[in-house]
Regions:
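Conserved short beta-strand edge segments in small beta-sheet-based binding/regulatory domains
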Residues: 36, 76-90
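A common structural junction motif
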Residues: 24-29, 73-82
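Short S/T/G/P-rich N-terminal loop/turn motif that feeds into the first structured element of a domain
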Residues: 1-68, 89-106
Length: 106
């Protein structure tokens, strides 16, 4: 099933999330690591500051495993909406936004 996901980034864990997305930690997670990485690469930051992306998931509870292992640690106010497939979202690329946050903290 495909979902549109909206959430607020937890700024205090942004650097950790970026590191795990780029060093293979999340990618190696089974069964959904690659989909999480791909989803974060599709994600955007909307004008309101919300992070928005689309993702495929086959858990009984939408994004159940993804939330337990990654998302609930790094995002708050996460909501899902069933959609027909991957969606295009308007906004700034999320990964570039993470890079900016990390650069400001160095």
């Amino acid at each position: 099933m495909f979902y549109r996901v909206r959430a607020q980034l937890r700024q205090d864990t942004a650097a950790e999330l970026r590191r795990k997305l780029t060093d293979g930690t999340i990618q190696s997670q089974k069964p959904d690591g690659q989909e999480i990485v791909d989803s974060m690469n599709r994600a955007v930051v909307t004008k309101s500051g919300e992070i928005e992306w689309s993702e495929v998931c086959y858990c009984d509870t939408p994004l159940g495993h993804e939330r337990a292992t990654v998302y609930d640690h790094h995002f708050g106010a996460l909501t899902t909406q069933l959609v027909d497939g991957y969606q295009e979202h308007q906004g700034r690329p999320f990964m570039a936004y993470l890079d900016e946050i990390c650069a400001r903290r160095q």
